[in-house]
Swiss-Prot record:
Pro-peptide region(s): 117-118
Keywords: Autophagy, Cytoplasmic vesicle, Lipoprotein, Membrane, Protein transport, Transport, Ubl conjugation pathway, Vacuole
InterPro entries linked to this entry: Atg8-like, Ubiquitin-like_domsf
Name used for this protein in its record: Autophagy-related protein 8
Protein role: Ubiquitin-like modifier involved in autophagosome formation. With ATG4, mediates the delivery of the autophagosomes to the vacuole via the microtubule cytoskeleton. Required for selective autophagic degradation of the nucleus (nucleophagy) as well as for mitophagy which contributes to regulate mitochondrial quantity and quality by eliminating the mitochondria to a basal level to fulfill cellular energy requirements and preventing excess ROS production. Participates also in membrane fusion events that take place in the early secretory pathway.
Membrane-topology descriptor: Lipid-anchor
GN (gene name): ATG8
UniProt source species: Candida glabrata (strain ATCC 2001 / BCRC 20586 / JCM 3761 / NBRC 0622 / NRRL Y-65 / CBS 138) (Yeast)
MF (Gene Ontology): phosphatidylethanolamine binding; protein tag activity
Compartment(s): Cytoplasmic vesicle, Autophagosome membrane; Vacuole membrane
Record's comment on post-translational modification: The C-terminal 2 residues are removed to expose Gly-116 at the C-terminus. The C-terminal Gly is then amidated with phosphatidylethanolamine by an activating system similar to that for ubiquitin.
Amino acid sequence: MKSSFKSEYPFEKRKAESERISEKFQNRIPVICEKAEKSDIPEVDKRKYLVPADLTVGQFVYVIRKRIMLPPEKAIFIFVNDTLPPTASLMSQVYQEHKDKDGFLYVTYSGENTFGYQ
């Protein structure tokens, strides 16, 4: 999944920004969160997040759910490098395993209707 953030900003600018963020906020992780292309789920109002290192993937999913005002009958799935990270994983662990060369962690979210409602 190609990130629109990556296509909008050159590598050098992204790397410089992530380094600046990491120096200023050492216990935070720079995350770019974007909706999957073909998903029918709402678009999130912002895509750059600075999350606490001890936040779990499940807690991050909750933050995204709230920001897009997703109804309870809709599911949301978070992908990092096209894989579903375990809900109990710490964002710092996911970051160490999957961070991009530019220093950001790229997360894609998608949804599907779990109960068949329209």
